């Protein structure tokens, strides 16, 4: 299986959601931004690298969320609660919009299926922050 990592970036009681532009099958849907872990790379290093590449900011992994979610027959998603440690997130080539969503607004966007199982725990995290 190929590990994909997603960043649940939290700031001021809100979660950052990113709307995909590619591929066509996922364009217009929302996700926790991130990407694939390269050979020889740790999951944490991959997440920090992917967020810098995709959003132009730096994050710090606070803790990994429980569970892994299958994406397809080849990829599996792990997600981490992250905080911003530098810069301001900006959409890059993979995303056309970013939104900060409070716990009562998490259902306002059309999340990709692998991200959905993480939402109840993230809602609880936001309510406690």
Regions of interest found by a model, annotated:
Residues 52, 58, 62, 127:
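HhH-family (HhH-GPD) DNA N-glycosylase catalytic core used in base-excision repair
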Residues 58, 66-90, 99, 103, ...:
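Active-site-adjacent beta-strand/loop module that shapes the phosphate/pyrophosphate-binding cleft
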Residues 1-16, 36:
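Conserved N-terminal beta-strand and adjoining loop/helix that marks the start
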Residues 123-129:
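Generic C-terminal helix-cap and adjacent flexible tail
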Residues 14-53, 57:
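Conserved Nudix-box catalytic region and its N-terminal flanking loop in Nudix hydrolases
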């Amino acid at each position: 299986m190929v590990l994909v990592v997603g960043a649940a970036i939290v700031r001021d009681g809100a979660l950052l959601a990113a709307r995909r532009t590619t591929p066509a099958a996922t364009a217009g849907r929302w996700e926790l931004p991130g990407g694939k872990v390269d050979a020889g790379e740790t999951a944490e290093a991959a997440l920090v690298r992917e967020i810098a590449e995709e959003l132009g900011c730096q994050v710090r992994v606070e803790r990994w969320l429980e569970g892994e979610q299958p994406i397809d027959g080849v990829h599996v998603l792990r997600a981490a609660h992250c905080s911003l440690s530098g810069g301001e997130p900006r959409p890059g080539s993979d995303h056309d919009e970013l939104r900060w969503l409070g716990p009562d607004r998490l259902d306002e966007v059309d999340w990709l299926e692998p991200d959905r199982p993480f939402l109840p725990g993230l809602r609880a995290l936001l309510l406690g922050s």
